[in-house]
Amino acid sequence: MNIDDKLEGMLLKYSPVGLQHPSRGLGPSRVDGRGRRGSLDMTLGERSLANHPLLAEDDDDEDEEEDDDDDLAGEGLTSHDLISQDDLMVHEETVKNDGQDEAAFSHRISNKLHYTLSMPVNIKQEMKVPDSLILNKKEKKPGRDPSDCHKKKKRKQRSPAKILTINEDGSLGHQNPKSHICEHCNAAFRTNYHLQRHVFIHTGEKPFQCNQCDMRFIQKYLLQRHEKIHTGEKPFRCDECGMKFIQKYHMERHKRTHSGEKPYQCDYCHQFFSRTDRVLKHRRMCHENKDRKVQKTAVKDSPLRTPENLGFSFPAKDCTLPKKKRQKTSDKSRASITNPAVDKVVEADMDEKTEDRLAKSECLPLYAVATKVKDEYVVTDYSVELPDSPPGSRHLAGEESNDEIISPPKLVLKKIASRRGFKQQALEQSQSLSPLSSFEESKVTRYTFEIVDNKGLLDVETNPDMESVEALQVGQAKPTGSSTNYDDAMQFVKKRRYLQAATANTSRDYALNVSSIVSQSSVTQASVATVIDETVPATILSETQTLNVEIKSSNEKNVLPDEVLQTLLDHYSNKANGQAEISFSVADTEVTSSISINSSDESSPAEALVTSSQAPPTEKASLLQEYSKFLQQALERTSQNDTYLNNQSLTFVNDSASLAGQPLFSTEKQFTSPPRFRPTMNSPLRSTLEKPNFNLLVDTQHSFSFSGDETNPSSVSPTEDFLDQVTSPKKTDPQSISQTFQITTFDQNFRSQFPSSRSGISPQFSIASGQVTLRGHGGADFPEFSLVNETRTQLTSSPDATSSQTFG
């Protein structure tokens, strides 16, 4: 049968499909037959037949059949893929003679129609179908990938394998591929062995146990693989590096480290990995945890879609999601919209159109993968708006009004910036202000363990002289009490050691000046202080201490021995009267610090803070050793009596140039401190004690010398001596401004109260050109007391020349 005979037979059937050429009309016309019957040549008679309701139903049935065929064959594939071999052979012949047969074919059709049906020839008309029907058909059949179409086609052509089994009665029967179904999870398996192995997962049974350990396994091969661990057998060896492995998979995975192969790719960001576990970890950490955030934002972003921005309203994350997850997110977003029914239908149609567009374009990225991944991490993780983000990830213009509703977590970066600004401010303050004002109050209390009772001391600047004095006089207004608790003394030792550790660990040079008022115990008394105020008793003010600490960074750790400190603490904590009549300043924790023997007035802590005397680095060890010896001898000198000397006075040397022009103290006022003595003691000092001369170099220019100088004229009274000591430094050495203050000189008001008390010899520190000399009053200083003259005659003998030593 030739082509003409087939054509005549089809034309006699009056079928609309029969008008098509069998060899090449099946393809394009059938695709168009779902919608429009595109370029089909029809006569007027056929148009009337097509409008007949019965024939129209037939057309709908044929359209549904064609839709089913397209579902099986796939969208975009022409129907000639399903034509039989005979038709394909005819198609090949007609394709060769395509140019020749086309004109003749149309001529034959017109002639046949003219003679058989007696109808006009060559009248073309397109059958128009409403757009709503076309849209409904498109909604019924969403777009699919070509790869999915090929898979479905192969699945249709391949018939399921039939398994021939022998029943119990001996008859043969066919069995389905997966007839063994699990009772727990309804999973189907091909054999009973696989089913039983799967059931072990639910029951927890592990029948295979290792002989060398207690581990059990579900399968036997797992046990055999585990036994290789005990035997040390590693049959698989790498060819490049020689490493051996128990499993072949491990060896292949190891070889990828040599070759650099990364066969596994992330579905989200298209990043490649060499191992599957790393892909899973990357997907779990970077993407799957963020799907929830994307879904939440999609719910809020979906009402903002408009027909103008449908192509760009999707976030950057949606385009990178797989198709199934993308459909789920779109379904959830559509379900969460609360709008009228009409709006729902319109928006659903627009969503489906955009899904078709995305399915055809496969969500091609609009920007590079690297920048996409970077922006995606920042946006989804911290919700930070990037100014240079690509168009796909930018928010819409309509979303700007919804910023108040959407409140994602934001990244706070103020902590690091504040630290940097804090450091810069600290540096600027240290450059512009004095060392005292450059340290904040928090830093000072950190090193002083919150022993600062007067906060006004930390805010003093050194440039105004009298203003600082007045501020400190106001601050020191409350009376303080004394206690002899030994725990306070031990607490002082602990604080000292902490200061040593804090300064030893730091490598940068800094000077931390701490001035505090320790008002609880006389054990930690560093200096006796007074305020020029007649209303405040001297007994109260003598219990107020000023701790002057100046810490210099030093790599050496030469400090005072613990034995010396312990003896000091034991001595002062066990005193009966609770008042420390003598105070040696052990406040300096480093050798580089000055040995500050401090008896300054309470109204001049600025002097104590600014004063700094440094010892030469080469003489640190010897200086510390001799000073400790001096302290031990002083303790031996005072250990026989509870109270040391009645006229004990420590002088404070101030080298500050800021106080040169104006003295801080009025020399017309004198304050007395009534001492308490036991009359049973013969002498507070041992007569056989040597009087060594300790010359301690504290600064490169000045030195403190302690000598037993007894050349004080007897005609000078204590009052005149005090006035001379106050005014003498300005007369002798105008360049080194030094001021001397005594606080416990006897006054006429208190001399009558102690007529029978034994008064000792008071070693005093006098200043001459920057040196402090230790001397005692002569016998005529206190003519009222005869015992003083007796003790002075014992000690005014000529000193031994060998006992005077100088350390420098």
From Swiss-Prot:
Record-linked SUPFAM superfamilies: beta-beta-alpha zinc fingers
Zinc fingers typed C2H2-type, residue spans: 180-202, 208-230, 236-258, 264-287
GO molecular function annotation: DNA-binding transcription factor activity; RNA polymerase II cis-regulatory region sequence-specific DNA binding; zinc ion binding
InterPro entries: Znf_C2H2_sf (IPR036236), Znf_C2H2_type (IPR013087)
Regions of compositional bias (Basic residues) in chain numbering: 150-159
Record's keyword terms, sorted: DNA-binding, Metal-binding, Nucleus, Repeat, Repressor, Transcription, Transcription regulation, Zinc, Zinc-finger
Main location: nucleus
Region spans: Disordered: 15-86, 131-162, 305-338, 596-617, 705-736
Annotated compartments: Nucleus
Gene Ontology BP term (one): regulation of transcription by RNA polymerase II
Acidic residues bias spans: 56-73
Sequence ranges of Polar residues compositional bias: 705-718, 725-736
SMART domains xref list: ZnF_C2H2
Domain of life of the source: Eukaryota
Pfam families found in the cross-reference section: zf-C2H2
GO annotations of cellular component type: nucleus
Additional remarks: Knock-down of the znf148 mRNA disrupts both primitive and definitive hematopoiesis, but does not affect primary blood vessel formation. Most embryos die before four days after fertilization.
Family: Belongs to the krueppel C2H2-type zinc-finger protein family.
Protein function: Involved in transcriptional regulation. Represses the transcription of a number of genes. Required for primitive and definitive hematopoiesis during embryonic development.
Protein name (record): Zinc finger protein 148
Species this chain originates from: Danio rerio
